[in-house]
């Protein structure tokens, strides 16, 4: 063996040792890692402490400019009726005759996501928590998913 092959063997051995050390460190701290992720999951897409938005700029969506977690739009399972798009502002709505509003419901999660995060600019919102209907079931559901 010449000195060059010995050098590469030493470098490869050191790299494998570092890989094993990192793997063992993750294995030993896996419980702490899961606890940290669970604690900070709500801040996943919010602005970081440094003020730099932690955003995926490849795709523009309605949540890109919002830093408050409760204001972000999300698709949630609506009891017995599929999926709805909700945020602290209310639900995305369908406007019926006489300008009545009802919650827009989707059959699948994919339909909800596609509609909620599409390029539609003019979206109607129905907030069931505005007086006089503060104690209705729709308002209670909205509060429970936020």
Curated annotation (Swiss-Prot):
It is found in: Virion membrane. It holds the Pfam family Pox_A28. Coiled coil: none annotated. Keywords: Disulfide bond, Fusion of virus membrane with host membrane, Late protein, Membrane, Phosphoprotein, Signal-anchor, Transmembrane, Transmembrane helix, Viral envelope protein, Viral penetration into host cytoplasm, Virion, Virus entry into host cell. The chain crosses the membrane at residues 1-21. GO terms for cellular component: membrane; viral envelope; virion membrane. Contains two intramolecular disulfide bonds. They are created by the viral disulfide bond formation pathway, a poxvirus-specific pathway that operates on the cytoplasmic side of the MV membranes. Residues 22-146 are virion surface. The keyword Transmembrane applies. It is a single-pass type III membrane protein. One of its GO terms (biological process) is symbiont entry into host cell. Belongs to the orthopoxvirus OPG155 protein family. Part of a stable entry-fusion complex (EFC) which is at least composed of proteins OPG143, OPG147, OPG155, OPG086, OPG094, OPG107, OPG104, and OPG099. Formation of the viral membrane is necessary for the assembly of the complex. Interacts directly with protein OPG107. Envelope protein required for virus entry into host cell and for cell-cell fusion (syncytium formation). This is Envelope protein OPG155. It comes from Monkeypox virus (strain Zaire-96-I-16) (MPX).
């Amino acid at each position: 063996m010449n000195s060059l092959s010995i050098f590469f063997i030493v470098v490869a051995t050191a790299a494998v040792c570092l890989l094993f050390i990192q793997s063992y460190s993750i294995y030993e701290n896996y419980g702490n890692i899961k606890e940290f992720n669970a604690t900070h999951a709500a801040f996943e897409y919010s602005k970081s402490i440094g003020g730099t938005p932690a955003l995926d700029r490849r795709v523009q969506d309605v949540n890109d400019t919002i830093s408050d977690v409760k204001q972000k739009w999300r698709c949630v399972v609506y009891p017995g009726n599929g999926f709805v798009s909700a945020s602290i502002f209310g639900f995305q709505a369908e406007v019926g005759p006489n300008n009545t509003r009802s919650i827009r419901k989707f059959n699948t999660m994919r339909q909800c996501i596609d509609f909620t995060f599409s390029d539609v600019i003019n979206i109607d919102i129905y907030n069931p928590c505005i007086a006089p209907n503060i104690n209705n079931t729709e308002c209670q559901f909205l509060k429970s998913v936020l």
